[in-house]
Amino acid sequence: MVGSVAGNMLLRAAWRRASLAATSLALGRSSVPTRGLRLRVVDHGPHSPVHSEAEAVLRPLYMDVQATTPLDPRVLDAMLPYLVNYYGNPHSRTHAYGWESEAAMERARQQVASLIGADPREIIFTSGATESNNIAIKGVARFYRSRKKHLVTTQTEHKCVLDSCRSLEAEGFRVTYLPVQKSGIIDLKELEAAIQPDTSLVSVMTVNNEIGVKQPIAEIGQICSSRKVYFHTDAAQAVGKIPLDVNDMKIDLMSISGHKLYGPKGVGAIYIRRRPRVRVEALQSGGGQERGMRSGTVPTPLVVGLGAACELAQQEMEYDHKRISKLAERLVQNIMKNLPDVVMNGDPKQHYPGCINLSFAYVEGESLLMALKDVALSSGSACTSASLEPSYVLRAIGTDEDLAHSSIRFGIGRFTTEEEVDYTAEKCIHHVKRLREMSPLWEMVQDGIDLKSIKWTQH
């Protein structure tokens, strides 16, 4: 029996060993591929939710990094002192405990700013990208509402952006939801035409969370700058994965999430330009922390973790991107070579390689997910995964409803291994073939029948 105290000590020791392993890997990253770091702790304590050793050890492979990434052990190492020893309130200015925490908070602010080419004073800590998106969209719209009552966004934004815009519509604002092309990329001419004299904000995400498409952010920033309209981008899926510079790209507001870049959950940031100054109306009242834009005590351990994750991303981005690109190519080629009628959703070139969305014709996506129970995958955004409706992102790019229902998102990240990619491809190929053999539609296609020519009737 392992008691809770001893279990916690074992957990911390295991993470420290993993951290040392990760550090040694980092030293040789130019030539040695990163191996997946797997931590499986079996706790047989009376309050443990795990009922057997098999359940604890035999966990699925993780291929859903768009939903969340594992915490990098080096990030945990940076956080631990502020969870145990340096627990002062960073806003307490009268003693050393507060000063220590404040210094750590400001260092984290510098680390986040450095990753995106910003001034540290332009970084505001939040609870995550959802809050950052709400502050950016509602904050700008409400501050300038006396003169400007119009916003522009796209139909494929994250749900929190779309819901924020719908909330503003209920307050009397007008919102233009731009369609996207079949590639998933917006038409820049349509964007220019959509901007009106009273447009206050354009919000376009950097990398789509479902299909991985990269929008032309620098070109959008140039258009917004020339029309004197503020430009916000939800960069939760892009920060730390692709190079971003808020000044070169003329970005006025940017949303950042900690748990999408191997940092902790519950923390994020928003970049708000100082020169020329972007004004936002605060969403919550309180002690006026974070320059009055986000009241509430800043959680020092979490922002330290976010800062450490950003610093690691800046150091290792190029290596990670090359490695993830090779693994993604290996996965797609393996599947496409062995399975007919597989469609890759979204633009194959303007695309972040770690997010792969494939549709398997004549297979129901939910059935395939259930069959692939030993691989953690998703059929779309984690924020809408409870819905059985086809993805609104896939509908927006013109995907047929049957293909939209058959889509699976594969996420490849920093700790994904070649063996995991090969195993996932092998299992996917096996189960797609098995499910197709059970499908009358697949049998009809094999017999040469054009399904689109059939007029289906209800009984």
UniProtKB/Swiss-Prot annotation:
Uppermost EC category: transferase
Gene3D superfamilies assigned to the protein according to its UniProt record, in alphabetical order: Aspartate Aminotransferase, domain 1 (3.90.1150.10), Type I PLP-dependent aspartate aminotransferase-like (Major domain) (3.40.640.10)
Required co-factors: pyridoxal 5'-phosphate
N6-(pyridoxal phosphate)lysine PTM sites in chain numbering: 260
Subunit structure: Homodimer. Component of the mitochondrial core iron-sulfur cluster (ISC) complex composed of NFS1, LYRM4, NDUFAB1, ISCU, FXN, and FDX2; this complex is a heterohexamer containing two copies of each monomer. Component of cyteine desulfurase complex composed of NFS1, LYRM4 and NDUFAB1; this complex contributes to the activation of cysteine desulfurase activity and NFS1 stabilization. Interacts (homodimer form) with ISCU (D-state); each monomer interacts with the C-terminal regions of each NFS1 monomer. Interacts with HSPA9. Interacts (via homodimer form) with FDX2.
Catalytic residues (positions): 383 (cysteine persulfide intermediate)
Protein name: Cysteine desulfurase
Residues where Cysteine persulfide is found: 383
Gene that this sequence comes from: Nfs1
GO cellular component: centrosome; cytosol; iron-sulfur cluster assembly complex; mitochondrial [2Fe-2S] assembly complex; mitochondrial matrix; mitochondrion; nucleoplasm; nucleus
PTM annotation: N-gluconoylated.
